[in-house]
């Protein structure tokens, strides 16, 4: 099956053609980073307008790079949520138009589900597995028993990890996207220079909290303004170390509690070099089978949307033309989709 997938949940306009939910024939991404960098973060209205400007181009390029026309496409998958409502609607509208015009089946896909399954585009992972989804809007731990079968084990109670990276970066004068800037500076810094707190590390749950850590950085900079200049590398490394330690140890606790020794780490923050290293060291020391997609598949893309899209379309699970954006869409609710179909 050839699936044309579209993604427009935040600030990346993307389209991809994927065969049988595993082989990427094309993956085109139009980034808006340079546009939003001026504002220090994503501006929803601007994001929607940029999606409108780019969506036709990325679809055309995806088809051209794959060497196929719309007449060869068997189905269309589109990110339905979670994300920015206006941004989501751009991709959804185009997907509906293509599906209607070509009489193709259409299915709305959960963006986070796409992240968790992106790894299947590079190597198969056996179910069940524990998954850590870390991005600008999410820091969640899941038990994954199959496509469409997810159990939330823990989640952020305030800021997501990616959000914390961006806010701290802005606080210390670094450009957007903050995670990339902090990762780059941290390479030359001492992660033990500043002892920042590790929120909720020993609370007995699998939940996360990064708001207090952000406040701790603000307090430190207020007391030591020189940290934003001469000590900025140490500051970046120390903050990053705190985030990575919490993410790794909470994930390790979930693995230990469930006894499932297969782990997937996904989402934009999974591009972070320190987090990848921390997870790899933990997995190697504890006999855990670790899978982290390549950075291109950790960042927002449409190829990952085709993985669950292909599966649902193959089952005959489709969406009607009343498909609407779901800015909030918990993964746990996806099981209802399969139950209703069966």
Curated annotation (Swiss-Prot):
Annotated localization: Cytoplasm
Top enzyme class: transferase
One GO BP annotation of this record: tRNA threonylcarbamoyladenosine modification
Coiled-coil ranges from the UniProt annotation: none
Record-listed Fe cation binding positions: 111, 115, 300
Sites where the protein binds substrate: 133-137, 166, 179, 183, 272
Function summary: Required for the formation of a threonylcarbamoyl group on adenosine at position 37 (t(6)A37) in tRNAs that read codons beginning with adenine. Is involved in the transfer of the threonylcarbamoyl moiety of threonylcarbamoyl-AMP (TC-AMP) to the N6 group of A37, together with TsaE and TsaB. TsaD likely plays a direct catalytic role in this reaction.
Protein name as it appears in the record: tRNA N6-adenosine threonylcarbamoyltransferase
Lineage of producing organism: Bacteria, Pseudomonadati, Thermodesulfobacteriota, Desulfuromonadia, Geobacterales
């Amino acid at each position: 099956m050839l699936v044309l997938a579209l993604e427009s949940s935040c600030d990346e306009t993307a389209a991809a053609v994927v065969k049988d939910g595993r082989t990427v024939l094309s993956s085109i991404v139009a980034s808006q980073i340079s546009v939003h960098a001026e504002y220090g973060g994503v501006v929803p209205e601007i994001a929607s307008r940029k999606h409108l400007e780019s969506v036709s181009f990325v679809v055309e390029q995806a088809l051209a790079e794959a060497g196929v026309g719309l007449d060869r496409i068997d189905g269309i998958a589109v990110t339905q949520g979670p994300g920015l409502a206006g941004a989501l609607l751009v991709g959804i509208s185009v997907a509906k138009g293509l599906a209607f015009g070509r009489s193709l089946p259409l299915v709305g896909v959960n963006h986070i589900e796409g992240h968790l399954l992106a790894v299947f585009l590079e190597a198969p992972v056996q179910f069940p597995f524990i998954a850590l989804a870390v991005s600008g809007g999410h820091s969640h731990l899941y038990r994954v028993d199959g496509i469409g079968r997810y159990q939330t084990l823990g989640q952020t109670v305030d800021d997501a990890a990616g959000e914390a990276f961006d806010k701290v970066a802005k606080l210390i004068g670094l450009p957007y996207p903050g995670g990339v800037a902090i990762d780059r500076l941290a390479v030359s810094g001492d992660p033990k220079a500043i002892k920042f707190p590790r929120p909720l590390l020993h609370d007995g749950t699998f939940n996360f909290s990064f708001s207090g850590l952000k406040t701790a950085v603000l307090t430190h900079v207020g007391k030591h303004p020189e940290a934003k200049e001469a000590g900025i590398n140490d500051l970046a490394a120390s903050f990053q170390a705190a985030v990575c330690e919490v993410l790794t140890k909470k994930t390790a606790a979930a693995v230990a509690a469930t006894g499932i020794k297969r782990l997937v780490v996904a989402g934009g923050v999974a591009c972070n070099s320190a987090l990848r290293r921390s997870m790899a060291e933990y997995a190697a020391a504890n006999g855990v089978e670790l899978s982290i997609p390549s950075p291109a598949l950790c960042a927002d893309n449409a190829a990952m949307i085709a993985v669950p899209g292909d599966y649902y379309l193959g089952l005959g699970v489709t969406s009607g033309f009343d498909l609407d954006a779901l800015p909030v869409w918990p993964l746990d609710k996806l099981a209802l989709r399969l139950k209703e179909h069966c």
